[in-house]
């Protein structure tokens, strides 16, 4: 059955929910000239689009075919519950039925399957939701991994036409792109280049017309350990596409596997810590400044994504290409899984604080202006308010990154000057900071002796290093100008968040639900869909044995919509509620309380 391509197969619902919800510098040994970062909060440059975010049986599809959607329903329901949208690759051969897409009967059957699938989820979730999905062709067709399906060049074109017409039969609003491959220069990558030619000049298998729609061009270009190499390859491919197929000059371009390095399971120490986190931010800043926001660039760049929806395995819980470190804890009955946020997920939480209007920002050193292809860079944004629950805010995200290299005794001297901040009620600023000394669960795991099955206390110690270090809100200078001086280790991230006080406190937390982890531990997840402001200090989690008197159980501030409750007493049966607290210590309404009753020990 066609399904979203995420590996490895078989994670349980708790792991999927956790993945879905997951997100002191040393003196410099090598002296460098200080970096000056200037940001003008009154000078908006351009929009800042975040290019980087029932029964299971169905009626017969004809020809005596029927499909069991039970597992796919469950997975897509879980994504929907966690407010996520899939990139949906139309690939696979249910029960081995499909074997040859030059067989006309199978081409018609594939079209019917795609149409059936699309209609099913339009009926289930609504067209408004499903039309936001990115449907895409078979993953990396030039690698010829077709699950025992014979896929000639003509067969691949027939398959594409069936995907296109199947989706169109369900709704013309559904988009389809491809080929999701590397586009090596011709004569290499014949299916990728051939698909572009077919979409322009080929004959549609079903309509007989010349040409087939291609709503976006999907590339897979990775960095070989270099941040700028990703962008350089994208530009080279787009130049060649425009040279060979100028009709695609205005077609949106996706790089939905823009990873720093190939090989998700290859253990790399830098993937475990802030090195990876800072590099991801650097790649995004490079794309915004050198491509998306560059008026001289003709690339219609629409989406950057990383291929990191994997679950790590022993003995490399942290160092594979994942967002979370996975521990398979086999010394409990039954065995269970624990996931820890890696710094790369924490960095994505910082990126989420950026808003929709890019601000003028510049980095210089010794008087020379530096572009985004240097060790220190910046991305800044502002938000104009809409409504009483909202107010003006700005975010300045500074990275210090030497790509995949970490330098224990090297730092960058930074002077950050933010000016042009308009006066506003209760104006405050908060800083968030990530480095390998303060924010590394991996480093804590090493200090604990790299336990294979960490104890609850050891997990608590590692989780204490998951989030950025946050400084409490401080009044913003009345002059509208702020100067901060820092030594930024390589690697590190610093975000400065400036907020005026909204008239209203935070909205209500919704969709609170508890999920069991193991005996004496549970996971709470919730939604922030009613939060009109991003200026939140923390979520306060409270617990009650009887639903009457509640007490806080969350400690350090965190704005991730997830909390692991692992008390020393291992008593977790009771009632839970959560509320948001903003930068001005104003709480929002509590969520509706939920009750959790732990299953008796077996």
What are these regions (language model features)?
Residues 62-227, 240, 247, 263:
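Substrate-binding cleft and catalytic face of glycoside hydrolase catalytic domains
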Residues 257-403, 407-409:
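Aromatic/acidic polysaccharide-binding cleft in carbohydrate-active enzymes
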Residues 368-445, 491-497, 534:
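Carbohydrate-binding surface patches
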Residues 453-502, 576:
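C-terminal beta-strand-rich structural cap/linker in extracellular carbohydrate-active enzymes
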Residues 475-476, 553-560:
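Short beta-strand segments within Ig-like beta-sandwich modules, predominantly Fibronectin type-III
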Residues 520-535:
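Conserved aromatic anchor
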Residues 565-588:
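Beta-strand-rich modules
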Residues 581-602:
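Extracellular fibronectin type III
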């Amino acid at each position: 059955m066609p399904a979203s391509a995420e590996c490895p197969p078989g994670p349980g619902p708790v792991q999927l929910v956790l993945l879905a919800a997951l997100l002191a510098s040393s003196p410099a040994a090598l002296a460098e000239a200080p970096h000056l970062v200037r940001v003008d909060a009154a000078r908006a440059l351009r929009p800042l689009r975040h290019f980087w975010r029932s029964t299971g049986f169905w009626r017969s599809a004809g020809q005596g075919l029927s499909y069991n959607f039970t597992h796919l329903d469950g997975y897509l329901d879980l994504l929907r519950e966690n407010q996520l949208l899939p990139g949906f690759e139309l690939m696979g051969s249910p029960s081995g039925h499909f074997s040859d897409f030059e067989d006309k009967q199978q081409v018609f059957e594939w079209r019917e399957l795609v149409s059936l699938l699309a209609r099913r989820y339009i009926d289930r979730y609504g067209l408004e939701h499903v039309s936001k999905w990115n449907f895409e062709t078979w993953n990396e067709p030039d690698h010829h991994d077709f699950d025992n399906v014979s896929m000639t060049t003509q067969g691949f074109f027939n398959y594409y036409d069936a995907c296109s017409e199947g989706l169109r039969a369900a709704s013309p609003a559904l988009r389809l792109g491809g080929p999701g491959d590397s586009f090596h220069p011709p004569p290499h990558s014949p299916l990728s280049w051939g698909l572009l030619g077919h979409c322009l000049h080929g004959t549609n298998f079903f309509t007989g017309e010349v040409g087939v729609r291609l709503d976006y061009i999907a590339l897979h270009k990775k960095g070989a350990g270099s941040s700028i190499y990703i962008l350089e390859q994208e530009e080279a491919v787009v130049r060649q596409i425009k040279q060979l197929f100028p009709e695609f000059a205005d077609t949106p371009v996706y790089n939905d596997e823009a990873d720093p390095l190939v090989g998700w399971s290859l253990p790399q120490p830098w993937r475990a810590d802030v090195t990876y986190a800072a590099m991801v931010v650097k790649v995004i800043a490079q794309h915004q400044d050198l491509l998306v926001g560059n008026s001289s660039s003709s690339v219609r760049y629409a989406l950057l994504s990383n291929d990191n929806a994997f679950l790590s395995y022993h003995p490399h819980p942290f160092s594979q290409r994942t967002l979370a470190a996975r521990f398979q804890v086999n010394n409990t009955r039954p065995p269970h899984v624990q996931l820890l946020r890696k710094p790369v997920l924490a960095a994505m939480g910082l990126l989420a604080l950026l808003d929709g209007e890019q601000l003028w920002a510049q980095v210089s050193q010794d008087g020379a202006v530096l572009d985004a292809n240097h060790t220190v860079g910046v991305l800044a944004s502002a938000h104009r308010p809409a409504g009483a629950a909202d107010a003006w805010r700005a975010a300045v995200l500074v990275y210090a990154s030497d790509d995949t290299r970490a330098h224990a005794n090297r730092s960058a001297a930074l002077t950050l000057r933010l000016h042009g901040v308009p006066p506003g009620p209760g104006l405050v600023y908060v800083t968030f900071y990530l480095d390998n000394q303060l924010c590394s669960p991996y480093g804590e795991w090493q200090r604990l002796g790299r336990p294979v099955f960490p104890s609850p206390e050891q997990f608590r110690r590692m989780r204490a290093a998951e989030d950025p270090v946050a400084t409490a809100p401080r009044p913003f200078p009345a002059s509208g100008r702020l100067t901060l001086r820092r030594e930024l280790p390589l690697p590190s991230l610093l975000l400065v968040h400036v907020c005026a006080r909204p008239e209203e406190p935070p909205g209500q937390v919704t969709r609170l639900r508890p999920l069991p982890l193991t005996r004496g531990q549970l996971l709470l997840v919730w939604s922030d869909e009613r939060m009109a402001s991003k200026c939140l200090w923390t979520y306060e989690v409270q617990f009650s044995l009887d639903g009457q008197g509640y007490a806080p159980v969350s400690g350090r501030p965190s704005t991730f919509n997830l909390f692991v409750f692992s008390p020393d007493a291992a008593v977790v049966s009771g009632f839970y509620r959560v509320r948001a607290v903003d930068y001005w210590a104003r709480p929002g309404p509590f969520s509706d309380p939920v009750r959790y009753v732990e299953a008796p020990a077996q």
